[in-house]
Each structure stands twice: as C-alpha cells, then as structure tokens.
Curated annotation (Swiss-Prot):
SUBUNIT field: Part of the 50S ribosomal subunit.
Name under which the protein is recorded: Large ribosomal subunit protein uL1
Underlying gene: rplA
Record field: transmembrane: none
SUPFAM superfamilies: Ribosomal protein L1
Originating organism: Rickettsia canadensis (strain McKiel)
GO cellular component term of the entry, any: large ribosomal subunit
Function, in words: Binds directly to 23S rRNA. The L1 stalk is quite mobile in the ribosome, and is involved in E site tRNA release. Protein L1 is also a translational repressor protein, it controls the translation of the L11 operon by binding to its mRNA.
Length: 239
C-alpha cells in the first residue's frame, strides 16, 4: 500500500509532466530556433537528455535507388563518449592505439564478437581485414556496426576515421517506412551549437535525395528530447 510520501512523489512527477506538456502545443508548427527553445523549457528530467530528430521521407527504401544512408560530422559533436574498435593487421596496431582507438586487434576482436562481447560503438577496419570480418557480418550488420566503405569505416586512413568517430560523426539510415531518426547533441548544449548540428544534419539528408524521385521528398520533421515533449517543424522554415 502506498504511503503519503510515495503519493506525493508520484503527484510531483505527474505535475512536472503536465507542466512540460503545457509549454509545447501539439497543434503548432515551429521553426528550428523556437523548437529548441521550447524543448529546453519543457524538459523536466534530472539527466542531460539528447536532442532527437525524426524525418519522414517520401521514399520507399525497398527500392535500391531510394536507400538513403550516410554520415554527418556534427560541428558541435554529440556530447557522447564513443568507444571505437579498429580491426587491422599487427603492423598497424600501434598506429590505431596512438590515434585513440579503444580496442585494437585482428582476429582477437573478431573472436570476441563471435562470443557476444561487443564493447564498442563504432567499428573501423582496414580493407585487408574485410574477408575475415565477413564471418561476423550477421552479428554486426543488424546492430549497425558492420564496417562500410561508404561510411568511411573501411579505410586505410585509420587516424582520420578514428578522429571522425570520436568527434561527433553520426550515421543516418532510412528505415522501411522512410523514417530517419538520430540524436544530434545534448539539450545542455547552447542553442547555437544545437542549431548548427541540426542544420548540418538536415542539409546532408536533403542532399541525399534520390535523383529520380517523384513527388515530395521531405514529408514531416519532428524534434524531441529524451523522455520529453515532441514538436513538429514547419517545413517551409527549412531553407
């Protein structure tokens, strides 16, 4: 049976949620600047939430020419600590370590992956290791961790790849319904930093529009914060 203290805590939490929702109008369209301001004022959680974007695209990813995928280097970073694994031959291990890789090895890392030990957020590989990595493709692929030359994670330039991963590189990929979702920084970032990240990301997705696509490409866009409110963006305000 709940005591008075428990009830007070629950009521307090409910009140914060109601107050937060009142600050964001569900029937209103916002430009990016106003959206960021609203989400900050409506945040009530005790941790530092992530600013998240959802973009609905007028594509059908089932068609190979409409698969939208790429990477964006966010100017202000993501605010997250990224653990990077590098799979390379022995002669390049020290180079990878010096560049800041958290895990470095060849078959040793592949064996750990097979055993279910995946303690990294990004996996970078040199081209000469891709044949061996193929044995764990079914494990890494569904997790979005499979090295890919189009994303810059299969490369001879280990140093630059590690730098990009650590400094705030974000991958985007359209899901089956044409939805792209990504985290673009912490809500504690300055408005300017968040807007820079947003503009960089949105511009990259818009540039990725398939050449032969008919009809509207950008259908809808929403911003939200972790466990917070969601606001819809006025697409006419996007340059």
């Amino acid at each position: 049976m709940s005591n008075k203290k428990d009830i007070a805590v629950k009521n307090s939490g409910g009140k914060k949620i109601r107050e937060a929702r009142e600050k964001v109008k569900s029937d209103t369209l916002y430009n990016l600047t106003n959206a960021v301001e609203r989400l900050k004022s409506a945040s009530y959680v005790k941790f530092d939430p992530t600013l998240e974007i959802v973009m609905k695209l007028g594509i059908d990813p089932r068609h190979s020419d409409q698969m939208i995928r790429g990477v964006v280097n966010l100017p202000a970073g993501t605010g997250k600590t990224v653990r990077v694994a590098v799979i390379c031959k022995a002669e390049r291990v020290e180079e990878a370590k010096s560049a800041g890789a958290d895990l470095v090895g060849s078959t040793s890392i592949i064996d750990e992956i097979k055993a279910g030990k995946i303690n990294f957020d990004v996996c970078i590989a040199t081209p000469d290791m891709m044949a061996a990595i193929g044995s764990v493709a079914r494990i890494l692929g569904p997790k979005g961790l499979m090295p890919n030359p189009k994303l810059g994670t299969v490369t001879l330039d280990i140093k630059n790849a590690i730098k990009n991963a650590k400094s705030g590189q974000v991958e985007y990929r359209a899901e089956k319904a044409g939805i792209i979702h990504a985290g673009l920084g912490k809500l504690s970032f300055s408005d300017q930093d968040l807007l820079q990240n947003l503009n960089e990301f949105i511009e990259a997705v818009i540039k990725a529009k398939p050449a032969g696509l008919k009809g509207s490409y950008l259908k809808a866009m929403y911003l939200s914060s972790t466990m917070g409110a969601s606001v819809q963006i006025d697409l006419t305000s996007i340059a």
